C-alpha cells in the first residue's frame, strides 16, 4: 500500500501528489530536502505522526462551516487540532531552535497565528456541547454577560413571568 498517511487530509494530499507529479526541479529538490529532514529526524517524524493521528479533518470541518452545516463538534475539533498544531510547532523548535530550514519553515508558517482562534473557541464553546446547534447550550455562560442573561431567561422564563403576574 502506497498510502501510509495518518490523516484524511494527508491521503488527499498524497492523491494530489500522485495525480499531478512535480516537474519543476526546484520544487522537487525542496520536497526531497523535507523528506531528508524527516529521515534524519525519525523520532520527531514519529512524534508528529502520532500527533497528526489525533487531529480532526480540518478541511471537512471548515467545509461544513462554510456550508452552514457545522456542529459544535466541528468547532471543538478545530480547537483541539490547533492545540496539537501548536505542540508540533513546539517540537520543531525544541529540536532545531528558531533557525529552521526554509522548507520546514514553509510547512510551519500556516500554523502561526492560530492561537487567537484557539483562545476564542476555548473561551466560548462548551466542552459538553450537544451535537446539534438547535439544542442550544453551546456557548459558555461566562463568555459574555448577555449570554448568561439569555440563558437565565430560557431556563427561568416561566417563573419570571409568574413573578411579574403576581
What is the meaning of each model-derived region?
Residues 1-166:
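Alpha-helical bundle segments enriched in helix-capping/polar residues
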Amino acid at each position: 500500500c502506497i498510502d501510509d498517511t495518518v490523516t484524511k487530509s494527508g491521503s488527499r494530499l498524497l492523491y494530489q501528489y500522485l495525480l499531478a507529479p512535480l516537474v519543476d526541479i526546484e520544487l522537487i529538490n525542496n520536497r526531497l530536502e523535507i523528506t531528508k529532514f524527516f529521515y534524519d529526524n525519525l523520532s520527531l517524524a514519529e512524534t508528529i505522526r502520532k500527533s497528526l493521528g489525533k487531529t480532526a479533518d480540518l478541511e471537512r470541518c471548515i467545509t461544513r462551516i462554510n456550508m452552514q452545516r457545522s456542529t459544535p463538534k466541528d468547532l471543538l475539533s478545530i480547537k483541539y487540532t490547533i492545540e496539537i498544531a501548536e505542540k508540533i510547532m513546539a517540537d520543531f523548535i525544541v529540536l532545531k531552535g528558531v533557525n529552521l530550514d526554509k522548507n520546514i519553515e514553509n510547512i510551519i508558517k500556516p500554523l502561526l497565528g492560530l492561537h487567537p482562534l484557539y483562545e476564542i473557541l476555548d473561551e466560548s464553546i462548551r466542552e459538553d456541547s450537544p451535537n446539534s446547534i438547535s439544542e442550544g447550550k453551546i456557548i459558555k455562560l461566562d463568555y459574555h454577560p448577555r449570554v448568561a442573561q439569555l440563558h437565565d431567561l430560557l431556563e427561568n422564563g416561566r417563573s419570571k413571568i409568574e413573578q411579574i403576574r403576581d
